Design a protein with these regions (language model features):
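Glycine-rich FAD pyrophosphate-binding loop
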Residues: 22-43
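Active-site-adjacent segment of FAD-dependent monooxygenases/related oxidoreductases
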Residues: 41-44, 49-117, 131
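Conserved FAD-binding catalytic core of PHBH/FMO-like flavoproteins
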Residues: 112, 119, 125-129, 134-264, ...
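Beta1/beta-strand and adjacent pyrophosphate-binding region of the FAD-binding site
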Residues: 1-13
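Generic enzyme active-site microenvironment
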Residues: 30-31, 158, 202, 284
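Conserved mid-domain beta->alpha element of the FAD-binding
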Residues: 10-23, 110, 158, 264-345
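C-terminal helical "tail/cap" subdomain of flavin- and related membrane-associated enzymes
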Residues: 296, 311-393
Length: 393
């Protein structure tokens, strides 16, 4: 079997790319190692930048999103004894907002629409080899239902995540990787409880905390813990008690407790691989970069990658020009490093670092005090939070 673009991975990057290519009449096949149920049930972040929502609208895939989403017009940052930084997006960035809609819901919508279009997604198709990536007709070998299959293509899009097969298929010595692991993790829970009014971050002497929304009836909360912490050590009561303390909700009147139905520890790290291309293989999304969750950027950065890639592929298949493909990596990496910078800034601003001296702690609090009084400082947070403009228009 031959196709123009082989997309490895049916996460947000691969699925958005498949729809962008379908719109342009470019043939593609999506290969996903996991089952459809597994892919659709993975709970991930749910903060969508304006540009991501706009793309779903352009593709005609936003009907359920419009019915079920929530809109965040602001975030709050708490610190000290009751100090509050209110970052109101419409006031600071010309009416732009962020949308709360779970990544798993985005994935469900994208999969359903692709299947309705009659476009192929091969679930439980494990890629076993990528060959000829430096040639103009790469070969992909994959296993499905116990049978070996071969797919040839003109372009391979590596959208299979941090632990996928695409990035390791690039020969040694080609990639430079940048990796930074922070000295803490996030203990996160999902609970059946109405969420707090605004997405709220907290910098407390005992550590970072975050209260966020998933739906009108589901809350997503986090507290900073040691990177090797075991979630089993945290009873539900212990978690709620710690969250109330870090959010300065001493009278327990603001954060509503409910049944916790998911609990786990997430590492906090940044990772970038450069370049994001080798021959006819183009990396996108988590296959190329991981950002700390503090900035809520992972899905949105993946969408930005594939928008750039889709335009480059359209130019290539329509006119034979490699010009946009040749600058794909540089274009994407400029945005990637800006997003890593912002996520690093928010992470450094809001967490307690075990190695910090009293001097460094006071610098952190001084930065928060500056943001409290500076519109320019709040503007910097707002324009990054709602999403930077796409460069490769």
């Amino acid at each position: 079997m031959h196709t123009q673009v082989a997309i490895i991975g049916a996460g947000p990057a691969g699925l958005f790319l498949s729809h962008l290519l379908y719109r342009e009449g470019i043939a593609c096949v999506v290969l996903e190692a996991r089952s459809r149920a597994y892919v659709e049930d993975r709970v991930r972040a749910g903060v969508l930048e304006q540009g991501t929502v706009d793309l779903m609208h352009e593709l005609g895939l936003d009907q359920r999103l419009r019915r079920e989403c929530m809109i965040d017009e602001a975030i709050d940052i708490r610190f000290g004894n009751g100090k509050l930084i209110h970052v109101h997006f419409p006031e600071l960035v010309a009416g732009r907002v962020v949308t709360i809609y779970g990544q798993q819901e985005v994935v469900k919508d994208l999969i359903a629409a692709r299947i309705a279009d009659g476009a192929p997604i091969q679930f439980e198709a494990e890629v076993t080899a990528l060959e000829g990536l430096e040639n103009d007709r790469p070969t992909i070998r994959y296993r499905k239902d116990g049978t070996e299959h071969t797919l040839t293509c003109d372009i391979v899009a590596g959208c299979d995540g941090f632990h996928g097969v695409c990035r390791p298929a690039i020969p040694d010595g080609v990639l430079t990787t940048y990796d930074h692991v922070f000295p803490f993790g996030w203990l996160g829970i999902l609970s059946e409880s109405p969420p707090i009014r605004e997405t709220t971050y907290a910098n407390h002497d005992r550590g970072f905390a975050l209260c966020s929304r998933r739906s009108p009836k589901i809350s997503r909360h986090y507290v900073q813990v040691a990177p090797d912490e075991d979630a089993a050590n945290w009873s539900d009561d212990r978690f709620w008690n710690e969250l109330h303390v870090r959010m300065n909700d001493g009278d327990r009147s603001e954060i509503v407790e409910g049944r916790i139905f998911q609990k786990g520890v997430t590492p906090v790290r940044a990772f970038v691989a450069a370049p994001m291309r080798y021959g006819r293989l183009f990396l996108a999304g988590d296959a190329a970069h991981i950002v700390p969750p503090t900035g809520a950027k992972g899905l949105n950065l993946a969408v930005a990658d594939v928008r750039v890639l889709a335009r480059a592929l359209t130019q290539f298949f329509r006119g034979g020009s490699m010009e946009r493909l040749d600058r794909y990596s540089d274009t994407c990496l400029r945005r990637v490093w800006k997003v890593v910078r912002y996520s690093w800034f928010m992470t450094s601003l809001l967490h307690r670092f075990p190695e910090h001296s009293v001097f460094e702690r006071n610098i952190q609090l001084g930065e928060l005090d500056y943001l409290l009084s500076s519109r320019a400082g709040r503007l910097t947070i707002a324009e990054n939070y709602v999403g930077l403009p796409l460069e490769d228009e």
